[in-house]
């Protein structure tokens, strides 16, 4: 019988698996340089971790070579350091974690929790966008096929520490989603769950554009018998057209000048308390103040237009991606 899982805020539910140490993370993909939107996610996850007295890890999610920009990974790390966001421990690269992903795929296959699928995107689009399990019991060979998770524990809702209880479309929750692509590349949902579990991440702070895959990731956590982390999805920074700032939408990279004005814009975006005379503080003291006064209650629940001076500063000095 299919189990319905609803992840809610309950200290009692998580008491048995609750680690003693908070571990957060920032996990960018090297498909371009950091921009103001990615700074929001990095800063929010950093402040949440430091405010809990916890660790903040950085992972480079370089599992999709066709989308990677040469040199982007090193520039991302340099930008984080330039903005004072120093991480704990070594940086993990997903391109060096293939053995762990293969081991997880093998375990799922041995448990009867995965299968091969040759359905095309056009077929699924004709079905309304959700896969119908057509290949689930066809016992297809591996050649030319993707691998899907056999969904046994669909997650219909989860609790977000900022947004409250969020519900998924039933078809999305029940879908047997892809965990290894037809071209042999490991799927994002598989890699992120395997790595977050490996790194002991206790809470994931990221942008609201990743709300939808969360129910899939929680389902995979459960089928792999890993503790499920907490979630906070931050509002998205938007451009003048109301679209999410992203590398695909040519968001300008963060400037390399004084990082404090851009950090102030990011703190304003998150509606955090600001020091009265921040110009008199160095970068270390500014971030220390931000950690001390960090509060989730003030964060807006929806995205907002990026400050114009931030866009102009970045574009005029460094152009667009």
Curated annotation (Swiss-Prot):
Q: Which cofactor does it need?
A: Zn(2+)
Keyword Kinase, does the record have it?
no
Q: In the UniProt record, which is one GO cellular component term?
A: cytosol
> Which InterPro entries does this UniProt record tie to the protein?
Glu-Q_tRNA(Asp)_Synthase, Glu/Gln-tRNA-synth, Glu/Gln-tRNA-synth_Ib_cat-dom, GluQ/Sye, Rossmann-like_a/b/a_fold
Record GO terms (molecular function) = ATP binding; glutamate-tRNA ligase activity; zinc ion binding
Annotated motif 'HIGH' region: location in the chain? 28-38
The note on cofactor binding and number reads:
Binds 1 zinc ion per subunit.
The kind of enzyme this is, by top-level EC class, is ligase
Binding-site residues, Zn(2+): 117, 119, 131, 135
| GO biological process, alphabetically ordered | glutamyl-tRNA aminoacylation; tRNA modification
- Per the Swiss-Prot or TrEMBL annotation, the motif 'KMSKS' region is positioned at 244-248
Sites where the protein binds L-glutamate: 25-29, 61, 188, 206
What EC number(s) is this enzyme filed under? 6.1.1.-
| Residues that, per the record, bind ATP | 247
> What Gene3D superfamilies does the entry give?
HUPs
Q: Which key words tag this protein in UniProt?
A: Aminoacyl-tRNA synthetase, ATP-binding, Ligase, Metal-binding, Nucleotide-binding, Zinc
Q: Which NCBIfam families match?
A: PRK05710.1-1, PRK05710.1-3, queuosine_YadB
Supply the name of the protein: Glutamyl-Q tRNA(Asp) synthetase
Q: Which source organism does the UniProt entry give?
A: Yersinia pestis
Gene for this chain = gluQ
């Amino acid at each position: 019988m299919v189990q319905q899982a609803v992840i809610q805020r309950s200290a009692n539910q998580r008491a048995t698996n609750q680690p003693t140490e908070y571990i957060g993370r920032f996990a960018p993909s090297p498909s371009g340089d950091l921009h103001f939107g990615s700074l929001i996610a990095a800063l929010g996850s950093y402040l949440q971790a430091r405010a809990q007295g916890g660790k903040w890890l950085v992972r480079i999610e370089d599992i999709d070579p066709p989308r990677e920009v040469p040199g982007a990974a090193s520039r991302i790390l340099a930008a984080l350091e330039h903005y004072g966001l120093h991480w704990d421990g070594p940086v993990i690269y997903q391109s060096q974690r293939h053995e762990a992903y293969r081991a997880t795929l093998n375990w799922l296959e041995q448990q009867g929790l995965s299968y091969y699928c040759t359905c095309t995107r056009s077929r699924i689009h004709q079905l309304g966008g959700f896969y119908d399990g057509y290949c689930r019991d066809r016992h297809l060979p591996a050649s030319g096929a993707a691998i899907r998770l056999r969904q046994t524990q669909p997650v219909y809702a989860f609790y977000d520490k900022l947004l409250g209880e969020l519900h998924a479309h039933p078809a999305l929750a029940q879908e047997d989603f892809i965990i290894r692509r037809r071209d042999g590349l490991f799927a994002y949902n598989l890699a992120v769950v395997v790595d977050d579990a490996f790194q002991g991440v206790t809470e994931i702070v990221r942008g609201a554009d990743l709300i939808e895959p969360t129910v899939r990731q929680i389902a995979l956590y459960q089928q792999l018998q890993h503790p499920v982390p907490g979630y906070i999805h931050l509002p998205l920074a938007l451009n003048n057209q109301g679209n999410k700032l992203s590398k695909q939408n040519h968001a300008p990279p963060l400037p390399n000048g004084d990082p404090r004005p851009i950090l102030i814009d990011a703190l304003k975006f998150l509606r955090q308390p600001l020091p009265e005379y921040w110009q008199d503080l160095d970068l270390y003291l500014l971030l220390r103040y931000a950690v001390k006064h960090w509060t989730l209650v003030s964060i807006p629940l929806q995205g907002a237009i990026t400050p114009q001076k931030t866009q102009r500063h970045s574009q005029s000095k460094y152009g667009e991606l």
